[in-house]
Amino acid sequence: MSKIQSFGSGVYELELTVPVRSTKFQPGQFLHLTLDDFDPTSGWWPESRVFSIASEPKQTFVTIVYSVKGNYTKRMEDELVVGKKIWIKLPYGDFVIQEKDTPLVLVAGGTGVSPYWPFLLKPRETGAVHLFYGVREENHILFFDKIQILKSQKWFHLHLMVENGSVKDLPYKAGRLSVSEIKNELGEKFDLADFYLSGPPVMIKTFKNDLTSLGIMDSKVHIDEWE
């Protein structure tokens, strides 16, 4: 464990240095993390949890973000310290964003923004990408420094919503993220877009149903379902 950053309200970013030259995964995939001892010769993997990988491939470290929601993540909050050695295994999952000429709409609720960063940090010259990112409080905005850098890119379009935000002159809208908000922002591009959903299960279900009701085909809606 090389770095632990707290965002408050039980939300943490962890950076783990890996003992190999680089990690191999595709943007959108996840890893398993265990707090318990593991013997690679036994073939038995202990209790673990899965987390989206929030760092770029081919780095000597991996980054994850988690929020304290149950007993296991509470253990993580209590037991993880810089310098501690833990076991992870990767990569897993098929929530892989496909490059297309049509608009890509990445919808994130809370820590659900994590799997998008390896994709967003890849160099590109064309193809519009819209990140619709909703959080409850302003201090829950993750990767704010990276967002500021991306805002200078012509292909990147940020739509940031803070549920309990104010109407101050800040770079976000106050309110809850919704499909109607996305449709209003995209206009005629809404029907052309591919949608990626990542966040709390209730949010994902609501967005999927709302997109379907507006005529978006299932093949154009991609869901991060490991949660």
How would you label these PLM feature ranges?
Residues 89-101:
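A short, basic/flexible loop-to-alpha-helix module at the beginning of a structural domain
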Residues 1-84, 136-137, 162-164:
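Ferredoxin-reductase
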Residues 28, 112, 200:
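Short, conserved phosphate/pyrophosphate- and ester-handling motifs at nucleotide-, phospho-/glycolipid
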Residues 113-124:
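Histidine-anchored nucleotide/phosphate-binding helix
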Residues 103-107, 196:
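Conserved beta-strand elements of the Class I
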Residues 132, 137-227:
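Reductase modules of NAD(P)H-dependent flavoproteins
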